[in-house]
Regions:
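Short, hydrophobic-biased segments on the C-terminal half of alpha helices
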Residues: 56-57
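Amphipathic alpha-helical dimerization/coiled-coil segments
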Residues: 1-7, 11, 83-113
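N-terminal helix-turn-helix DNA-binding core of bacterial DNA-binding proteins
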Residues: 2, 7-50, 70-83
Length: 113
């Protein structure tokens, strides 16, 4: 793999890693509904403000979010709203996985009777 291709994959991985935490996923899905202030995000995810701020910083650095000041508030929104489509794909993959596992459990329970 050449250096440019490697760098491209590293940047892609950075974006995926920026979404790769349960709190960050919740923030992304919340911000899919529109711009929100930190106070609303903290309330929604139920985490400490400092913890939420750290997660927001990771996503800002990766280019997933953007922020702006509105008086004393800091407002956040998705910089790349299409990330929600990626998460919908992840949701579908999870549903399919759960269906496969449910089928295996059903088969196992019928064998053990």
């Amino acid at each position: 793999m050449d250096a440019d291709t490697k760098k491209f994959y590293e940047l892609k991985a950075e974006i995926i890693q920026a979404a790769g935490h349960p709190i960050r996923l919740a923030i992304i899905e919340f911000l899919a509904k529109g711009e929100k202030c930190v106070c609303d995000i903290v309330e929604r995810v139920g985490a400490q403000r400092s913890n939420v701020s750290r997660h927001l910083s990771v996503m800002l650095k990766a280019g997933v979010l953007e922020s702006r000041k509105d008086g004393l508030k800091v407002m956040y929104k998705l910089h790349t709203p299409c990330i929600v489509n990626f998460l919908a794909c992840v949701d579908q993959a999870l549903r399919e996985r759960m269906q496969r596992e449910a089928a295996v459990l059903k088969k196992l329970s019928s064998v053990s009777r």
